[in-house]
Amino acid sequence: MLYKSIDEFVKVIDKKKRIIGLDFGEKKIGIALSDKTNLVAIPYSVYIKRSTRKDLGSLYNIFVENNVGSMVIGWPIELSGIESELCQKVVLLANRIIAKYKINIYLHDERYSTAMATRVAKLANIKRKESQSIDDKIAAMLILQQVLDIMKIYQI
């Protein structure tokens, strides 16, 4: 099921499984995973998009290999709060994942996540050229970590 409410999403999380976080872009998908305790988000990879079928298959392999039970996807709304064009693509992807793999997905406001990822890379003294290849997975990590921190409040 697709959730835009964190209140509803936290009720359906399988505590025994990990959570995957995605930063969905036009050409790439940043991927992060929670640790086994669902307390810490860890950058996982940057996936270069190919076709929907191949993308879904690759994501499924990650689900299985890492015991994933739920997903958080960055919701790319504009700074003004208006849904961006990419929002429709995110919903389409989310609905395809749900239909095919029966996984619960939460759409989390991702405003500033890419800017924060760039800042994190800069603070870690990672050169700009290098950081461009990891910004997406850092953004996914930041998005997922925000949700994990909220879950701590709910004591999930």
Swiss-Prot record:
A single MF term (Gene Ontology): nuclease activity
Homology family: Belongs to the YqgF nuclease family.
Species of the source: Ehrlichia canis (strain Jake)
Function text: Could be a nuclease involved in processing of the 5'-end of pre-16S rRNA.
The name this protein goes by in its record: Putative pre-16S rRNA nuclease
Main localization category: cytoplasm
Gene Ontology CC, one term: cytosol
Pfam family, one: RuvX
PANTHER family: POLYNUCLEOTIDYL TRANSFERASE, RIBONUCLEASE H-LIKE SUPERFAMILY PROTEIN (PTHR33317:SF4)
